[in-house]
Swiss-Prot record:
Entry superkingdom: Bacteria
Keyword field: 4Fe-4S, Cytoplasm, Iron, Iron-sulfur, Metal-binding, S-adenosyl-L-methionine, Transferase
Gene3D superfamilies: Aldolase class I
Family stated for the protein in its record: Belongs to the radical SAM superfamily. Lipoyl synthase family.
Any GO molecular function: lipoate synthase activity
Identification of the protein by name: Lipoyl synthase
Reactions performed catalytically: [[Fe-S] cluster scaffold protein carrying a second [4Fe-4S](2+) cluster] + N(6)-octanoyl-L-lysyl-[protein] + 2 oxidized [2Fe-2S]-[ferredoxin] + 2 S-adenosyl-L-methionine + 4 H(+) = [[Fe-S] cluster scaffold protein] + N(6)-[(R)-dihydrolipoyl]-L-lysyl-[protein] + 4 Fe(3+) + 2 hydrogen sulfide + 2 5'-deoxyadenosine + 2 L-methionine + 2 reduced [2Fe-2S]-[ferredoxin]
Length: 310
């Protein structure tokens, strides 16, 4: 069991001792290929941060401490995190704040559309915290955002959704009426490590969510992502890729897990660029339409390019 550490500001949760830094377990040194060069001009980055803050909106880029934030913000792109900034789950790999969920901002869909227009975006990615407190898991709010954004023509919408634990049927019924252009749900890692990495989630149910969406919306691409470096084995990764292919997933992303803070899971291994290239080859050989592999690859990193190349 994960023991909650009382910290009202950061809402940090204690993780198992075997995965925390200690004298017996040294922290792996970050390799050179993971070093990021900050852009010289921070004007666009600060502009997006200011706009989001002013409208009380959130980006997963900021909330999850994404390493690609400087590049994405500098290119004028961001992944909107809807339904608040506090997650009802306690996944020990994730930097997003955990705790009691916030009240839904009913004006959020319109606020997002305003920003989309202001930033002249043509591709929008929506994601959310897990909302186990809601009867539909937050699916209706996703659909409202999709509906609002599509008031502006020629904008593609990708959604990266939680697993809607116990509310999958309700959520899928809603998405059938208001489908996105790409449906994304991250499998994250291998089933053997699920109880450690995704407590409260279920590997088979995540696969089934992807399968059921594809069943009701066969013409809409489905997508999923993995993060490596948490102790998984190569054969397990290949097995997960085969499972994803079997449920109709056509786009897959594979990146390196990076420890957000000392209070999160330790990195067990840094995967080399060569190894990522090998996984890309394996995934393509399994029949995926598009595969994006690399140390800094994230589910919504260059999502617009992923869609355009589909």
């Amino acid at each position: 069991m994960l023991k909650e550490k009382k910290d009202k500001e950061k809402n940090i949760y204690m993780i198992p001792k075997i995965l925390k830094s200690s004298k017996s377990k040294s922290i792996l040194k970050k390799p050179k290929w993971l070093k990021i060069k900050l852009p010289s001009n921070l004007k666009k980055i600060n502009k997006i941060k200011k706009i989001l803050k002013k409208n009380f909106l959130h980006s997963v880029c900021e909330e999850a401490n994404c390493p690609n934030l400087p590049e994405c913000f500098n290119n004028g792109t961001a992944t909107f995190m809807i339904l608040g900034s506090i997650c009802t789950r306690k996944c020990p790999f994730c930097a997003v704040t955990k705790g009691r969920a916030q009240k839904i901002d009913k004006n959020e869909p319109k606020k997002i559309l305003d920003i989309v227009i202001k930033l002249k975006l043509t591709y929008v990615v929506l994601t959310s915290v897990a909302r186990d407190d809601l009867k539909d898991g937050g699916a209706k709010h996703f659909s409202k955002c999709i509906y609002e954004i599509r008031k502006k023509k020629n904008i593609k919408v990708e959604i990266l959704v939680p697993d809607f634990r116990g509310k999958e049927k309700i959520a899928l019924k809603i998405f059938n009426k208001f489908p996105p252009d790409i449906f994304n749900h991250n499998i994250e890692n291998v089933p053997r490590l699920y109880s450690l990495i995704r407590p409260g989630a279920d590997y088979i149910k995540s696969l089934n969510l992807l399968y059921q969406f594809k069943k009701i919306c066969p013409n809409i691409p489905t997508k999923s992502g993995l993060m490596l470096g948490l102790g998984e084995k190569k054969k397990e990764i290949i097995s997960v890729l085969k499972d994803l292919k079997s449920v109709g997933v056509s786009i897959v992303t594979i990146g390196q897990y990076l420890q957000p803070s000392k209070n999160h899971l330790l990195v067990q291994k840094y995967i080399t660029p060569k190894e990522f290239k090998n996984f890309e080859y394996i995934a393509l050989s399994l029949g995926f339409s598009k595969v994006f592999c690399g140390p800094l690859v994230r589910s919504s990193y260059h999502a617009d390019r992923q869609y355009l190349s589909f």
